From Swiss-Prot:
Superkingdom as given in the UniProt entry: Bacteria
Residue intervals passing through the bilayer: none
Classification lineage: Bacteria, Bacillati, Cyanobacteriota, Cyanophyceae, Synechococcales
Keywords tagged on the record: Ribonucleoprotein, Ribosomal protein, RNA-binding, rRNA-binding
Organism: Synechococcus sp. (strain WH7803)
InterPro entries according to UniProt: Ribosomal_bS20, Ribosomal_bS20_sf
Protein name: Small ribosomal subunit protein bS20
GO biological process, any: translation
A Pfam family this chain is assigned to: Ribosomal_S20p
GO MF entries: small ribosomal subunit rRNA binding; structural constituent of ribosome
Cellular component GO terms held in the UniProt record: cytosol; small ribosomal subunit
Gene3D superfamilies, alphabetized: Ribosomal protein S20 (1.20.58.110)
C-alpha cells in the first residue's frame, strides 16, 4: 500500500488511467466488430448501401485505432496489426479473390 502522499496520488492516477484506457479499448473493439459484421452483411447481400456501410465502419475503426495509438492506449505496432486485420477483412469482402483456373 502507498505510504506517502505522492505515491497515493500515483495509485489514484494509475487507476483512473486504467479505467479510461479500458473504456477506450472497449469502444475500439466494438467498432472493429461492427466493421467485421458489416463485411459479413456485404458478403450476404452485396450492394452499394452495404459497401458504403463497410467503408464507413472501416473508417470509424481506423480513426479510433489511430487515436488510441496517439493517446498511448495501444502500442504503434499493435495498432498497425489491428488495422491490417480490418483491411484484409474488408478487401476480402469487397474484392473477393477470383477462383483459380486449375
Amino acid at each position: 500500500m502507498a505510504n506517502n502522499k505522492s505515491s497515493k496520488k500515483r495509485v489514484e492516477i494509475a487507476e483512473r488511467n486504467r479505467l479510461q484506457n479500458k473504456a477506450y479499448k472497449s469502444s475500439m473493439r466494438t467498432l472493429m466488430k461492427r466493421c467485421f459484421s458489416a463485411c459479413e452483411a456485404y458478403n450476404a447481400t452485396p450492394g452499394d448501401e452495404a459497401k458504403t456501410s463497410v467503408q464507413a465502419s472501416m473508417n470509424a475503426a481506423f480513426s479510433k485505432i489511430d487515436k488510441a495509438v496517439k493517446r498511448g492506449v495501444l502500442h504503434r505496432n499493435a495498432g498497425a496489426h489491428q488495422k491490417a486485420r480490418l483491411s484484409v477483412a474488408v478487401k476480402k469482402a469487397i474484392d473477393p479473390a477470383p477462383a483459380s483456373a486449375s
